[in-house]
């Protein structure tokens, strides 16, 4: 009985958190990833990045023009955050030396990282921070790993800025790594 109450309490807390994020940041209005839209709502995105920057759960914006991706990403991972937008899973803030790892669900071409498997070597990925600084990364490789393999997070030159994107391969439960 206690377990069920605890589970319900956590579920209710997570739902309230999701509702709060959606109402405070209106994330669904901001997404411009539909095929009919060529507009990137950068003014809206940058206004949410600048608002309450000390407690802002949004760390930045990820843009991948080659596959029409333009999303805010959360400063930290949680199951609730990941339902709403990509999340920083590991590493430094954008523009810092190290490997910033961003997770995004694969919603089969509807949103988030559905098409990262289509990226090619040298495709550009841009991260924007809350000061509107842009940090440019270029795809070095796209590959799959077993869903329990976290080695791509740690496999990088410690003296450079790296970005690793991770999403699910919805066919065989592997992870797609960029």
Where are these regions (language model features)?
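Solvent-exposed, non-transmembrane regions of membrane-associated and secreted proteins
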Residues: 1-178
């Amino acid at each position: 009985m206690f377990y069920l109450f605890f589970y319900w309490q956590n579920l209710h807390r997570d739902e309230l958190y999701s509702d709060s994020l959606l109402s405070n940041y209106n994330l669904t209005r901001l997404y411009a990833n539909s095929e009919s839209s060529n507009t990137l709502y950068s003014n809206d995105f940058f206004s949410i990045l600048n608002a309450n920057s000390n407690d802002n759960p949004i760390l930045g914006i990820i843009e991948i023009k080659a596959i029409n991706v333009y999303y805010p990403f959360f400063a930290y991972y949680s199951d609730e955050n990941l339902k709403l937008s990509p999340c920083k899973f590991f590493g430094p803030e954008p523009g810092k030396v190290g490997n910033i790892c961003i997770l995004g669900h694969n919603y089969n071409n509807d949103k988030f990282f559905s098409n990262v498997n289509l990226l090619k070597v040298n495709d550009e990925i841009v991260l924007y921070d809350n000061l509107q600084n842009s940090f440019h990364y270029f795809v070095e490789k796209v590959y799959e790993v077993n869903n329990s393999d976290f080695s791509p997070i740690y496999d990088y030159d410690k003296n450079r800025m790296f970005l690793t994107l991770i999403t699910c391969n919805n066919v065989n439960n592997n992870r797609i790594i960029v």
